[in-house]
A protein has these predicted regions:
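Structural preference for beta-strand elements that scaffold enzyme active sites
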Residues: 1, 195, 200-202, 254-256, ...
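Extracellular and organelle-lumenal recognition/adhesion modules and their flexible linkers in secreted
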Residues: 1-242, 273-283, 290-291, 361, ...
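Conserved, mostly hydrophobic/aromatic
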Residues: 2, 25, 101, 197, ...
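The substrate-binding groove and active-site-proximal loops of carbohydrate-active enzymes
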Residues: 87, 171-183, 229-244, 261, ...
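Acidic-and-aromatic substrate-binding clefts and catalytic sites of carbohydrate-active enzymes
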Residues: 108, 133, 264-265, 311-315, ...
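An active-site-proximal structural segment forming one wall of the substrate-binding cleft
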Residues: 144-156, 162, 175-199, 203, ...
């Protein structure tokens, strides 16, 4: 299978085909270590001197999306609001692009707004228009056709009337997405993943799932519903998640969603809503407060209902149907926890979640966690906990030298067959400098023969990380590297493809 996490710009600017960066004006310095340039106007600029751009929060489209742009235009046809996309906007001659925005008029009457695709030499290579005249939020849609190829184009919004405009959710999507889906995946990148023939997809993390601090734990409910109502989230890898890429399918693989076990990453350093002092801003932060655990557990159960519930008879099944998927996903697995330190705080909350899922949904296999290494305290205590509770499967992670994989062919030969099954959820061979080369790929291939031989114990495997965008990597090696116009599978990719 494959493991997808939004690291290395894997989602926004990557697999998610949206071409506009900071479309929701929700970037904030806290996304990026208090970088003051990473703010609500990041990636946006004003061309011309007769207009100003500011950010407002009064009467937004939705409380989950509180910031929007105020474009105050004092000279018609002479100023533009520009967006440079993610390292530029790549366009293909003759292809169509879906444009949309939410807009309203704050002062004046508004009017026609030109929407241009502009190459880096300032040549207009695509144009359409929308009308922004309403005093209330209203979505406008149009289609642009690129008249030439471009590697680093920009989007230009040019009001034709003097007015003060409120704008939000400014979006540009290629019509040629993977399988032609609206709000879909970048076609070439998604096809490269599909060519691995994954039997399952683990998502959304990884570290993203349990987050940097309790308030950064991945809230799956914020990733579904209309795009303008989704709740953006700070990415602990140092950037922003629009969460346009939500909980749905596109490759026919089994879903393996991962939820936090009521605790954030043990390396957290961001204060939670209940933190009382600097000490309680660190580590697992005491876990989700016990008075909030009932609701947290209900959120876990609601995810299963969203995936499997009857679209006519259940609350969350109905929401899935409203999203365009009345047929259940037939969810079989759910991960609880990720590489966690097995502390009393973790154990108490994991037990509560595990017992609730087992009682309500015995048909769903809960996957526990045994820490980030193939040995050590968390590995041993995690296995002891799984054995005590009867957890049906555990998630093992390890990043090791090629030599370890070569000399540990018997690693799973001696596992107790009466205990939990294993999901090797994250692994890779690491060399100094972190290349993905023939040596690492051969070591991984050799090790997978031993894993396959022990298929009665190790039921699932996935390499990590999966994707990395040039110039935006937080981790190496990765399986697939890409930029706006190219996708470059590594040698290790072909190892995974052979086993797929």
């Amino acid at each position: 299978g494959i493991f997808f996490e939004d690291i290395n710009y894997g989602a926004d600017g990557g697999l998610y085909a949206e071409l506009i960066q900071n479309r929701d004006f929700e970037y904030t310095p806290t996304d990026r270590g208090n970088d003051q340039n990473w703010n609500s106007t990041h990636s946006w600029s004003v061309q011309g001197s007769d207009a100003t751009l500011s950010i407002a929060t009064e009467n937004p489209i939705h409380p989950n999306n509180p910031h929007y742009a105020v474009f105050d235009v004092n000279a018609a046809e002479q100023t533009a609001l520009m967006n440079a996309g993610f390292d530029g906007i790549a366009l293909k001659k003759g292809e169509k692009y879906d444009f949309s925005l939410f807009g309203k008029v704050l002062e004046g009457k508004g009017g026609k707004v030109l929407v241009n695709l502009v190459d880096k030499d300032e040549t207009i290579i695509g144009q359409t228009a929308v009308n922004v005249t309403s005093k209330d939020w209203k979505q406008q849609k149009a289609v642009l056709t690129a008249t030439s190829d471009a590697v680093a184009a920009s989007l230009s919004i040019v009001p034709q009337a003097v007015s003060k405009y409120a704008l939000d959710m400014i979006s540009l999507f290629p019509q040629k997405t993977f399988k032609g889906r609206k709000n879909g995946l970048r076609a070439d990148l998604a096809q490269t993943l599909a060519d691995l023939h994954p039997r399952f997809v683990r998502f959304p993390g990884g570290c993203v799932a349990h987050g940097d601090g309790i308030d950064n734990i991945y809230d799956w409910k914020g990733s579904i519903g209309p795009l303008e109502a989704r709740k953006p989230l700070r990415n602990l890898w140092g950037y922003h998640q629009t969460r346009g890429l939500g909980y749905h399918e596109d490759m026919g693989a089994e879903p393996v969603p991962v939820l936090a076990a009521g605790v954030p990453c043990q390396n957290s350093g961001t204060c939670a809503h209940h933190s009382k002092d600097e000490l309680t801003c660190m580590g697992q932060q005491g876990g989700v407060p016990m008075e909030e655990m009932d609701q947290y557990i209900q959120d876990v159960l609601d995810l299963i209902e969203y995936a499997n519930g009857d679209a006519r008879k259940t609350v969350w099944g109905k929401k899935r149907g409203e999203a365009g998927h009345p047929k259940p996903f037939n969810l079989k697995f759910i991960g609880i926890g990720n590489e966690d330190m097995i502390t009393p705080v973790f154990v108490e909350r994991f037990k509560m979640i595990f017992d609730a899922v087992k009682a309500k949904h015995p048909e769903v296999t809960v996957i526990g966690t045994t820490g980030p290494f193939y040995e050590g305290t968390d590995y041993e205590v995690g296995w002891d906990l799984a054995t005590e509770l009867g957890v049906p499967m555990v998630d093992e992670h390890y990043y090791v030298e090629p030599g370890w994989m070569i000399h540990n062919q018997e690693y799973y030969d001696h596992y107790d067959r009466s205990k939990a099954k294993v999901y090797l959820g994250e692994y890779a061979a690491h060399l100094p400098g972190r290349p993905n080369n023939v040596e690492t790929a051969l070591a991984e291939a050799l090790y997978l023969t031993a894993v396959e031989r022990n298929g009665d114990v190790v039921e699932m495997t996935s390499y990590a990380p999966l994707l990395a965008k040039d110039g935006h990597t937080q981790w190496n090696p990765d399986l697939i590297y890409f930029n706006n116009t190219e996708v470059r599978p590594t040698v290790g990719y072909y190892t995974q493809q052979m086993y797929g």
